[in-house]
C-alpha cells in the first residue's frame, strides 16, 4: 500500500492530439440516438444534429441516456463545470461520450469547483473518449479529472476510458491528500457495505494524464479485506467500519497510457483478479513524496509488461521511489518485458502488510541507470523469482553525488519475514559498486557479474564482461538492442533452462528449448516454446532426500544424488520433454565433482520408437572438490530431434559412495 510510504512501515503499497472522429454506424450493435453539444448551441434545440446542437453540460446531465446513445462534443469547444451523464448502455451497445468534428479535443474544465470534472456513477456499459479534462482550483480540496464510481451496485460491466487528455488536476499540495489514491487524473472506485461491488471488463487505454497533484491512474475498492489487511488509509472516503471482504474486479486493462509529472503514484491497480498493465509510458512520478511509477495491491495474477517507467523521485533510503512495486496482499504477479530507467529509488520493490504476501516473478526486463535500491524486499516479500533480467547500474551523477550513497544497495532486505527469493540467469553490471544487503532468504544462481561486489552465495557465478553490443545507451523501450550479446559474449547459451519461461525475450525473440543466453536479450532465436520441465527418472533411485526432478528444474542449488551404497554401472538418467526439441549438446552441472561427479557416459535419443545411441564414450573431467558449481559440456556428433534423452552412466567418482548431479541441460 502507498500513502506517504516508507519501506519499514507496515504498509499496504502518445496520445493523439486531435479529437476523435465519430462513426456511429460502425460503433454500435444497436443504433441509439446521437446528441451533439456545441458552445454556440441552444439547450432549447433538439440536439440531434450539429446545426441543432445543445449548449451546456447541464442539458447533458439532465438527459437519461439509453443503450447505443452517444453524446458528442464539438472539437475545439470548451465547457466549465461537471459532466455527469445518466443512464447505462448494454453489452455491444454502450453509451458513448465523445467528440465530433476536427481540431483539438473538446475541453471539460471543472475549474476546481467540482469534485470531478467528469463523473460516471452507478452506470455500466459507458465509454468516455476523446475529451480534454482538467480540474484546477485553489485550496486543499481533493479533486479528480475523470471519476468512475459505484456503490452497492454489484457487478459494473464494460466501462471504458480511452483517448482522453487529463491534466492539471490540482487538489492538496501537501499532506495526506497529495498521496491519496482516491484522488487523481483517472480514478475508479468500488464502494458500499451491503452489495459487493466490482468491475468487469474495465478498460483504461491510450490516455495522457499529466500534472496531477496526487495519482495518475488508479483503481481501488472498499471491498478489500483479506489476509489481515482490514482497511486502507484513514483519509480515504470510507466511513469507519465501512470496509468489506475482498471482492476483486476482473478484466481490468490499463494499456497504452502516457502518465507523467505526477505527485504520487503513476498507475495503481488495487483489488483485482487477472489485471493487465501494459504498454504504458510513466515518467516523473513521486514528485511530492515517496511513491512508485506502477504498483498494485490486493491483486492476484497481475501481468505487468511492455511498460517504460522512468524518473521516479528519491525521498530517502527507506522511502519508495522505484519503477515497479508488488505491494500488499498480491499473489502470482508477473513483471516482464519492461524497461526501467533513471528511477532514483530503484527498479523493483516488494512489500506487504497483514499476513498476505507480496509475490512476483520478474523476468526479461532491462533496468538502466536506476538508483538507491535496485531490488528492495520488505514485509512478507515471498516467492520472488528474478531471472533473465539485465541490470545496468553505472555510477550515475545521482548516485555519485547523493549523501546517502553509502546506504545504496543492489539488493536490500528490510525485514526478517522475507522468504524464498532467487536471482538466476541475470546480467548485473554494477559500476556503481552497490552492496548486497540481503539475508539467508535470498539465493543467487548462475548470474553474470561485471564490476562491483559478487554475492558469495552464487556458487555458479560468472564474473566477466558480458560483451554486450552497446549497453547503457538505450533511449526508450523500443531501443534495447544495445543489450544484445555479441557473438563472443560469455552469456550465450550459459543460462539455466527455466521451465515455463514465457517463450520469448524482452524484445520478442523466441527462446530456445534448451539453455538460453543470460540476461534479457537472446542472441539466436529458438523455437519459442513455453514448456514445463521434463520428467526425469533415475535407475539408481534417490538418496539424501533428493528427487530426480531436481536434475532439470532450472536450479543448480537443488541437486539429485543417488543412494550412498550399492552403486553399480551402467545406470541411466532419462529426461522426457513435453515435445520434440533439437539437441546438439548436453551440459552437466555438479558440485564436489571430484568426489561424486559422473565420469564416462553414453547418450541415447528416442527415435522411431526406440532408443538410438547418439554419443558413445563421452568423458567428463571434474577439478573441483567444493560447493562451487562446475559445468562440463559435451557436443553430439550430429544434432538430433527428440522428445527423450537417456544418459547411460558408465562410471563416476564415488568418494562417498554416491553420484550427484546439480543440473542437466540441453543445447
Regions found by a protein language model. Give the residues of each.
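Predominantly extracellular beta-rich ligand-binding scaffolds that present long acidic/polar faces
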Residues: 81-86, 92, 114, 337-340, ...
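Surface-exposed loop/turn segments connecting beta-strands in extracellular beta-rich domains
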Residues: 81, 135-137, 141, 164, ...
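Extracellular beta-strand/beta-solenoid scaffold signature
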Residues: 84, 111-119, 140-152, 174-199, ...
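Right-handed parallel beta-helix/beta-spiral solenoid domain characteristic of secreted/periplasmic
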Residues: 54, 72-73, 88-141, 168-178, ...
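Aromatic, loop-rich ligand-recognition surfaces of beta-strand-rich domains
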Residues: 553-615, 619, 628-667
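Acidic Gly/Asp/Thr-rich repetitive segments characteristic of extracellular carbohydrate-active
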Residues: 39-74, 78-79, 117, 489, ...
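C-terminal accessory segments
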Residues: 459-524
Amino acid at each position: 500500500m502507498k500513502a506517504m510510504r516508507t519501506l519499514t512501515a507496515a504498509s499496504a503499497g502518445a496520445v493523439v492530439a486531435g479529437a476523435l472522429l465519430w462513426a456511429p454506424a460502425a460503433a454500435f450493435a444497436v443504433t441509439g440516438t446521437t446528441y451533439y453539444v456545441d458552445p454556440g448551441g441552444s439547450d432549447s434545440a433538439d440536439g440531434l444534429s450539429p446545426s441543432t446542437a445543445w449548449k451546456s453540460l447541464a442539458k447533458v446531465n439532465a438527459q437519461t441516456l439509453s443503450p447505443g446513445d452517444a453524446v458528442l462534443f464539438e472539437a475545439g469547444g470548451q465547457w466549465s463545470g461537471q459532466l455527469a451523464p445518466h443512464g447505462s448502455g448494454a453489452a455491444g451497445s454502450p453509451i458513448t461520450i465523445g467528440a465530433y468534428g476536427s481540431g483539438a479535443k473538446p475541453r471539460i474544465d471543472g475549474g476546481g469547483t467540482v469534485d470531478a470534472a467528469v463523473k460516471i456513477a452507478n452506470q455500466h456499459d459507458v465509454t468516455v473518449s476523446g475529451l480534454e479534462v482538467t480540474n484546477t482550483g485553489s485550496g486543499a480540496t481533493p479533486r479528480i479529472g475523470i471519476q468512475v464510481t459505484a456503490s452497492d451496485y454489484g457487478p459494473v460491466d464494460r466501462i471504458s476510458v480511452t483517448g482522453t487528455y487529463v491534466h492539471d488536476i490540482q487538489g492538496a499540495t501537501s499532506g495526506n491528500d497529495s498521496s491519496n489514491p482516491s484522488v487523481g487524473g483517472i480514478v475508479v472506485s468500488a464502494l458500499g457495505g451491503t452489495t459487493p461491488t466490482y468491475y468487469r471488463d474495465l478498460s483504461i487505454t491510450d490516455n495522457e494524464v499529466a500534472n496531477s497533484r496526487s495519482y495518475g491512474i488508479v483503481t481501488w475498492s472498499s471491498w478489500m479485506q483479506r489476509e489481515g489487511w482490514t482497511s486502507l488509509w484513514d483519509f480515504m472516503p470510507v466511513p469507519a467500519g465501512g470496509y468489506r471482504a475482498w471482492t476483486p474486479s476482473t478484466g481490468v486493462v490499463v494499456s497504452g497510457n502516457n502518465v507523467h509529472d505526477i505527485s504520487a503514484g503513476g498507475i495503481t491497480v488495487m483489488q483485482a483478479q487477472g489485471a493487465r498493465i501494459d504498454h504504458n509510458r510513466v515518467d516523473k512520478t513521486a514528485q511530492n513524496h515517496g511513491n512508485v511509477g506502477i504498483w498494485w495491491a490486493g491483486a492476484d495474477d497481475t501481468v505487468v509488461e511492455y511498460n517504460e517507467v522512468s524518473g521516479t523521485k528519491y525521498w530517502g533510503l527507506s522511502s519508495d521511489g522505484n519503477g515497479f512495486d508488488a505491494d500488499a496482499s498480491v499473489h502470482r504477479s508477473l513483471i516482464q518485458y519492461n524497461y526501467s530507467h533513471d528511477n532514483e529509488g530503484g527498479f523493483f520493490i516488494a512489500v506487504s502488510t497483514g499476513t498476505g504476501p507480496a509475490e512476483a516473478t520478474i523476468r526479461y526486463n532491462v533496468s538502466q541507470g536506476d538508483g538507491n535500491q535496485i531490488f528492495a524486499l520488505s514485509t512478507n516479500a515471498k516467492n520472488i523469482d528474478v531471472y533473465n533480467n539485465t541490470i545496468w547500474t553505472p555510477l550515475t551523477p545521482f548516485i555519485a553525488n547523493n549523501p546517502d550513497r553509502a546506504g545504496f544497495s543492489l539488493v536490500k532486505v528490510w525485514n526478517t519475514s522475507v522468504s524464498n527469493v532467487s536471482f538466476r540467469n541475470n546480467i548485473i553490471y554494477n559500476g556503481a559498486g552497490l552492496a548486497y544487503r540481503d539475508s539467508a532468504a535470498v539465493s543467487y544462481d548462475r548470474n553474470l557479474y561485471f564490476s562491483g561486489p559478487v554475492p558469495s552465495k552464487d556458487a555458479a557465478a560468472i564474473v566477466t564482461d558480458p560483451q554486450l553490443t552497446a549497453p547503457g545507451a538505450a533511449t526508450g523501450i523500443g531501443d534495447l538492442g544495445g543489450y544484445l550479446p555479441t557473438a563472443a559474449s560469455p552469456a550465450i547459451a550459459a543460462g539455466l533452462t527455466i521451465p515455463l519461461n514465457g517463450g520469448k525475450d524482452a524484445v520478442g525473440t523466441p527462446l530456445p528449448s534448451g539453455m538460453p543466453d543470460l540476461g534479457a536479450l537472446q542472441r539466436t532465436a529458438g523455437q519459442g516454446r513455453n514448456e514445463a520441465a521434463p520428467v526425469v527418472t533415475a535407475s539408481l533411485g534417490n538418496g539424501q532426500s533428493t528427487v530426480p526432478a531436481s536434475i532439470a528444474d532450472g536450479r543448480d542449488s537443488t541437486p539429485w544424488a543417488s543412494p550412498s551404497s550399492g552403486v553399480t554401472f551402467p545406470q541411466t538418467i532419462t529426461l522426457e520433454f513435453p515435445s520434440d526439441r533439437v539437441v546438439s549438446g548436453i551440459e552437466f552441472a555438479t558440485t564436489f565433482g571430484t568426489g561424486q561427479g559422473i565420469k564416462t557416459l553414453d547418450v541415447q535419443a528416442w527415435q522411431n520408437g526406440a532408443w538410438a545411441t547418439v554419443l558413445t564414450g563421452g568423458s567428463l573431467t571434474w577439478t573441483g572438490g567444493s560447493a562451487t558449481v562446475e559445468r562440463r559440456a559435451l557436443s553430439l556428433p550430429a544434432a538430433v530431434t527428440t522428445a527423450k534423452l537417456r544418459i547411460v552412466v558408465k562410471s563416476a567418482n564415488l568418494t562417498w559412495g554416491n553420484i550427484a548431479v546439480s543440473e542437466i541441460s540441453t543445447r
